[in-house]
Amino acid sequence: LMKMKNLSMLLLVFMGYGLIMLGSSTEAAFLLETVVWEKSCVSFSFSVLVDEMSIIFMGVVLTISGSVSVYCSWYMNEEVYYERFFKLLWLFVISMMFMILIPNLIMVLLGWDGLGLTSFLLVAFYQNNKSLASAMLTALTNRVGDTLVLASISFMLNEMNWVIYNYSPMITSASIGLVLILAGMTKSAQVPFCAWLPAAMAAPTPVSSLVH
């Protein structure tokens, strides 16, 4: 069973390399959209945007997460909560996929919060005072990013639109782009939102490598 898991993880690594090469050699773009809720003139749709950039990013995520998973299968093998760790790790990866593929700000917020929640649980994995304090710092910094994403959603609401690919600096308020950049700075640990990154080292070593 362990060998099958390792093979599947290696397959993800090769799949990631394949997606990177595919994204680098294609210019095609596909938008899949379905209406989830509709009331009179207001509707909410679920969209998936697949273009060269999202394919490359998916490839990068799969390559890194697959490599980390192969390492984890050896490094975390004797941990009591080994299965729980892997479930949290792949919930983290799925949340990243949400942010890559879905151009709707509401659904991006779900992926964003998924990253925040799984980051908190992974940093607090060892359940001691240091890891819990580090997890709380990580969570609070992510809440700043959540607030900024919610602010961008409210700005987009004034435009009667939540879809990122319809954003145009010539038409839409430039403050939306600025707020989204600031939100991204909290997640990527840019100054002045970088305090959580060294604190996240309290997580298991493979998590630190994945986050960095």
Regions found by a protein language model. Give the residues of each.
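Core, highly hydrophobic multi-pass alpha-helical transmembrane subunits of bioenergetic inner membranes
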Residues: L1-H212
